[in-house]
From Swiss-Prot:
Region entry Disordered, spans: 49-78
A molecular function (GO) term: rRNA binding
Classification via SUPFAM superfamilies: Ribosomal protein L4
Quaternary structure (record): Part of the 50S ribosomal subunit.
Protein family: Belongs to the universal ribosomal protein uL4 family.
GO biological process: translation
Chain's role: One of the primary rRNA binding proteins, this protein initially binds near the 5'-end of the 23S rRNA. It is important during the early stages of 50S assembly. It makes multiple contacts with different domains of the 23S rRNA in the assembled 50S subunit and ribosome.
Lineage of origin: Bacteria, Bacillati, Bacillota, Bacilli, Lactobacillales
GO CC aspect terms: ribonucleoprotein complex; ribosome
Superkingdom of origin organism: Bacteria
Gene behind this protein: rplD
UniProt keyword list: Ribonucleoprotein, Ribosomal protein, RNA-binding, rRNA-binding
Protein's UniProt name: Large ribosomal subunit protein uL4
């Protein structure tokens, strides 16, 4: 099993933590990670685009002129697509772009991105992130003590609200729970800052 250093909030190394090789030590599957990232990005699209077809455009209920005898082409409505101000043919309608991938694929993608961060030495383990109250300055001190000055994803245990509130005003810092972190979140981060309890949760969820 791989070992990573375990730090406290002051940046002091206090111990080490063993990581499960089946989760943090596999050969990353880039193809699967790519598929999951595309899927998650598709799910983020709003899909609220809409145009009016001939039935939705106001007016046009009356036949503009009689069928025969005028010498002009026959017309049934001034809201037909060929008319100026008429309806749009085959235009976009509100829809969801999201689609689901098999659970095994999503789990393999998570294991792959976690393993990649560990292999690249971009996985920082911390004993805990406890704050008496939400304080942005206190969280900034923790990041400074751990020499983290890049885009970071902080993974905390469920119920650690003060950590999330303390970090939300800091640029380039995202906080998520270990059970809900997505592949897209992890890929977008330069480093992972993970609490000891969060590591246990990750291993419990993915094992």
């Amino acid at each position: 099993m791989a070992n990573v250093k375990l730090f406290d909030q002051t940046g002091k190394e206090v111990s080490s933590v063993e990581l499960n090789d089946a989760i943090f030590g596999i050969e990353p599957n880039e193809s699967v990670v790519f598929d999951v990232v595309i899927s998650q990005r598709a799910s983020l699209r709003q899909g609220t685009h809409a145009v009016k077809n001939r039935s939705a455009v106001s007016g046009g209920g009356r036949k503009p002129w009689r069928q025969k005898g005028t010498g002009r082409a026959r017309q049934g409505s001034i809201r037909s697509p060929q008319w100026r101000g008429g309806g749009v043919v085959f235009g976009p309608t509100p829809r969801s772009y999201g689609y689901k991938l098999p659970q095994k694929v999503r789990r393999l993608a998570l294991k792959s991105v976690y393993s990649a961060k560990v292999a690249e030495d971009k996985f920082v383990a911390v004993e805990g992130l406890s704050f008496a109250a939400p304080k942005t300055a206190e969280f900034a001190k923790v990041l400074s003590a751990l020499s983290i000055d890049t885009k970071v994803l902080v993974l905390v245990e469920e119920g650690n609200e003060f950590a999330a509130l303390s970090a939300r005003n800091l640029p380039n810092v995202t906080v998520a729970t270990a059970a809900t972190a997505s592949v897209l979140d992890i890929v977008n981060a330069d480093k992972l800052l993970v609490t000891k309890e969060a590591i246990s949760t990750i291993e419990e969820v993915l094992s």
